[in-house]
């Protein structure tokens, strides 16, 4: 069997935390395979799109694979927390503006248990403003501003199981002057490497 169709102006609510609005997509359903194409939606007021999301069913698991795109967005701390809460601890963010391209895959059980999450992201960070209350650098940088600004960063993030690798570069404004930085941060379980 095969079923083709589309959804226009769909709405979903997941556990009163994720509100999906203006959902538009084309779907194709076959035996143990589902395809969602030309997906456009708004999740907690943030625009997302995907050219293709493929879902295949094997025994008691669904394997989900796709590309998720975000257009350039100004996000609040609360929006970030709602979208990324299960993956990231959000520091004291004052402002963030970025766009991203994300390849994702994961398994989900019929009881909605997620595992084997893999994310490969390319992020163009236009601006990130953090309140510096998480690390004391005053002894090293006496003129340190309360706010740290990151601008024009190109970032690649790879996440798999308990390992995350972040590589990037861009401008940082710490002491009233801008510097260009390159960085690589790896977190394996609870161990960080810089």
Language-model regions, residue ranges each:
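Membrane-proximal interfacial segments on either side of biological membranes
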Residues: 1-194
